[in-house]
Swiss-Prot record:
Cross-referenced InterPro entries: HATPase_C_sf, Ribosomal_Su5_D2-typ_SF, Ribosomal_uS13-like_H2TH, Ribsml_uS5_D2-typ_fold_subgr, Top6b_C, TopoVI_B, TopoVI_B_transducer
Residue positions binding ATP: N48, D80, S101, R102, G111, Q112, Q113, G114, I115, G116, I117, S118, K435
Keywords for the protein's UniProt record, in alphabetical order: ATP-binding, DNA-binding, Isomerase, Nucleotide-binding, Topoisomerase
Protein name: Type 2 DNA topoisomerase 6 subunit B
CDD domains noted in UniProt: HATPase_TopVIB-like, TopoIIB_Trans
GO molecular function: ATP binding; DNA binding; DNA topoisomerase type II (double strand cut, ATP-hydrolyzing) activity
Taxonomy, superkingdom: Archaea
Keyword Isomerase assigned: yes
PANTHER family found in the cross-reference section: DNA TOPOISOMERASE 6 SUBUNIT B
Function per UniProt: Relaxes both positive and negative superturns and exhibits a strong decatenase activity.
Cellular component annotations (GO), alphabetically ordered: cytosol; small ribosomal subunit
Organism: Methanosarcina acetivorans (strain ATCC 35395 / DSM 2834 / JCM 12185 / C2A)
């Protein structure tokens, strides 16, 4: 008798493990080319290191080393000073897909699914046929544990090839070494160097060292010793819950009554709100949640929309902050102007999120190319699929011409600008498992739009100010060319000394005039007066620096003193209203006439040089 075709087909059907699935679909996780595979591996390891260090309250110190081991193969070593991993967990952490501690935690974190580093181990054994080496230590008084691991793709379980105790110089930390088919590239935005540079900008508390295949070492120093505030885990918010998820929660809850179930299973639901929800759903607050079916669960979902429930708490987020974004950009770029913005937290589908933006302008950034957009999600750089990301779409939709940048044909504008956009959330809505781009969620796009426009307005103000300063500079150049010639001619006619033209220039320009008057007393002492006159129409606050090789006496007002080897920097904090004058005086006890004649130029800190006459000036930070 002929066997039915259905039975023949049934014999061929079998389940596959998640490891087998990703073994045949590695491109889903970002292992689709030789250069990208290396970047993805480094990214996953560095993410783990940063998360572990921050959770343990340790300032991260991370080493990334890449060595060529063949024409198409590299060995990559990532080492950190984190808390280490206990011996029993090492094989599962590195050689079991979908194994981790953050999947169910509702708080901001870099890694979540428990796939990343295990996928790198899987890729290494697939392409190079080699095991992965792990060394980890949890404290200075315990030995380090060394493992050599591979993944059994049929069972998604670790194969332990070696397990032994070793000595290690680090008091605590973890090291992973993988050999794989990959390529180390330079000079691209999508490279290990650019990835680590971007990581250093948004993680200014981390120190990251890169040793490339040629032995060159690049250190991205930390800009702060402050570890980010830890993100707190929160309960799910009713706004974003789905029917199936709610039914599962009702089925598995330990609560015996509906009202307590609502209070202790969701955030921002108190006693009164729970009663309101039950009333809106037409359900008894005392009913056993296990007895509720699909129909009742749907009523609860509808009640969540009817009852006013507070937004979820935002302590589950850990934004970078405007000051540290500024420091990160300042540390890793050479630019003329930096502006930052951190928006207030917002919510999409019950998930709190916050958008932060930094803008750097000028310096050595290319002037005739499209602006650079650096995208980040939960402090992790997004290097690929820029065109498919909501952050890029928000930038493209802004009319940049009104902010001083050209935008021929629309889209990304042209100019010497680096735009940093960071989205932090407990659940970043990526477009794919490879986490390359953020989905087009309207409220996220709106927040990005508002944050970018805020820094764009600051840029517009800066460019307008620079334009005005340029005009002043051109005007002053003309004046300083004409006036001296006039002064010489008038002095010759009147048979008098050529006068100092600085007061006249300052008055014409509306500048701040700063100059020194020295009166020698004939006994080796001298009285010095630093005179300040504000000819402008607005007030100025600034610092006056007097750099001298000797000590002074009788200073009025008393300056701050900074000692530098054999020299002294006397610093006065000065505020000068429009049209006002100030005098800073002091006495020098012993100085020759020649020394008095060679006193260094006064320095004014806090004002653009175009607004000051008679002294050297700089704006400062």
């Amino acid at each position: 008798m002929e066997i039915p075709i259905a039975e023949e087909l049934a014999k061929k059907q079998k389940s596959i493990s998640v490891a087998e699935f990703f073994e045949k679909n590695r491109q889903i996780l970002g292992f689709d080319s030789a250069p990208r595979s290396l970047i993805t591996t480094v990214k996953e390891a560095v993410d783990n290191s940063l998360d572990a260090c921050e959770e343990a309250g340790i300032l991260p110190d991370i080493l990334v080393q890449v060595e060529r081991t063949g024409q198409d193969y590299v060995t990559v070593i990532i080492e950190d000073n984190g808390p280490g991993i206990v011996r029993e967990q090492i094989p599962k952490v590195f050689a079991k897909l979908l194994y981790g501690s953050r999947f169910h935690a509702l708080k901001q974190s870099r890694g979540q699914q428990g796939i990343g580093i295990s996928a790198a181990v899987l890729y290494a054994q697939m392409t190079a046929g080699r095991h992965t080496k792990i060394l980890s230590k949890t404290g200075s008084n315990v030995p380090a544990h060394y493992y050599e691991l591979m993944i059994n793709t049929s069972t998604n379980e670790p194969d332990i090839l070696m397990d032994e105790v070793r000595d290690w110089f680090r008091p605590h930390g973890t090291q992973i070494e993988l050999e794989m088919k990959a390529a180390y590239v330079k000079g691209r935005r999508q490279s290990i160097y650019e990835y680590l540079k971007a990581t250093a900008i948004v993680n200014p508390h981390a120190r990251i060292t890169l040793i490339d295949p040629d032995g060159n070492e690049e250190v991205f120093e930390r800009a702060t010793d402050k570890i980010p505030d830890p993100a707190e885990e929160i309960l799910p918010h009713p706004e974003g819950i789905e029917l199936g998820t709610l039914m599962k929660m009702l089925h598995y809850t330990e609560r015996q009554k509906l009202a307590p179930f609502l209070r202790y299973s969701f955030c921002k639901i108190g006693l009164l709100t729970a009663d309101e929800i039950c009333k809106a759903a037409g359900l008894d607050p005392e009913i056993d949640p296990h007895a509720l079916g699909r129909h009742e669960a749907r009523k609860l979902i509808e009640a969540f929309q009817k009852v006013k429930i507070m937004s979820p708490p935002t302590d589950c987020l850990s934004p970078i902050g405007e000051e540290l974004i500024y420091r990160g950009l300042e540390k890793e770029t050479n630019v003329d102007f930096i502006a930052t913005s951190t928006r207030k937290p917002a919510v999409y589908s019950g998930n709190p999120f916050v958008v932060e933006v930094g803008l750097a302008y000028g310096g050595n950034l290319p002037k005739e190319e499209k602006i650079s957009i650096m995208r980040f999600a939960n402090r992790v750089p997004l290097l690929y699929q820029q065109g498919g990301c909501v952050t890029t779409h928000a930038v493209e939709d802004i009319r940049w011409k009104q902010y001083g940048l050209n935008q021929p044909g629309g889209g990304v504008p042209i100019g010497p600008v680096l735009l940093l956009i960071h989205v932090a959330s407990i659940n970043v809505p990526f477009t794919s498992e490879s986490k390359d781009a953020i989905a087009d969620i309207p409220v996220i796009k709106e927040e990005v739009d508002l944050a970018v426009k805020e820094v764009a307005r600051k840029l517009k103000h800066y460019l307008s100010k620079q334009s005005n300063l340029k005009k002043r500079r051109e005007k002053e150049i003309i004046i300083t060319k004409v006036l001296p010639k006039m002064a010489v001619k008038v002095a010759n006619i009147l048979e008098k000394d050529v006068p100092d033209i600085n007061p006249v220039v300052a008055k014409i320009m509306g500048n701040l005039l700063v100059y020194r008057k020295v009166k020698s007393n004939g006994d080796g002492t001298a009285d010095v007066a630093i005179k300040v006159k504000n000819f402008g129409t607005s007030a100025h606050s600034f610092r006056v620096h007097e750099m001298l090789p000797c000590k002074i006496n009788g200073a009025k007002p008393e300056p701050k003193v900074v000692t530098m080897d054999n020299d002294y920097d006397y610093v006065w904090d000065v505020s000068a209203a429009a049209g006002s004058s100030k005098v800073l005086s002091y006495k020098i006890e012993s100085a020759t006439v020649e020394e008095l004649r060679k006193l260094p130029q006064l320095i004014v800190e806090g004002i653009e040089e175009e607004l000051v006459t008679g002294a050297k000036a700089f704006r400062g930070v």
